Amino acid sequence: MLRLTKMLYQTSGDMAYMDYYERALYNHILSSQNPVQGGLVYFTPMRSGHYRVYSQPQSCFWCCVGSGMENHAKYGEMIYASRKDELIVNMFISSVLEWKEYGMTFTQETSFPEKESTRMVLHTDKSKKMKVSFRCPEWIDKSKVAFAVNGKKAEATLTDGYYTIERKWQDGDAIEMTLPMTLRAVQLPDKSSYYSFMYGPIVLAADMGKERLDGQFADDSR
């Protein structure tokens, strides 16, 4: 789905596709690999109280393992986009972008989603007038969004789902954006009676122990 989402965004520029991409990245791709023994799995149960069954490194190998490894290369794939004289920040992920056409480097520093902010530092060979736009995600509290440039409050224009700051940028300029998250109940896409609780783009889950969680790791019959 992320491949399709990527192509639809590149064709339309619709920010809504990046909302979906972000949600899938954090809640599906990130959790598709077991953090302890490295097993992989695609299937993500939507039913309350259910769990995943991961592969085991030495006894299981199926499509979830082979193509599942590729998924984790997507963390850096859609962080940025660009138009003429405009850099677009779609994902709030620590990263470094070298924009060779403009002789500029952008360093994004963030602990999102643990902290509700991100910081972008620009390095450039010479001053450059251009736009820097940040995605306005569906989950954000717009009334509390704030920007600062070099520590001073800055105004950003919200257009077509993006906050934009346009100015003449100097080497070392830094942009800070607050990312105020909200807690909400979201009905599942099938319009069933099931809801997920989300904080920002993150689906919340509770540790319910391991009772009756048999077969969390697949055996060699699969």
List each model region and its residues:
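A general beta-strand register signal
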Residues: E98, A146-A148, M198
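Glycine/proline-rich low-complexity spacer/linker segments in large multi-domain proteins
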Residues: L179-R222
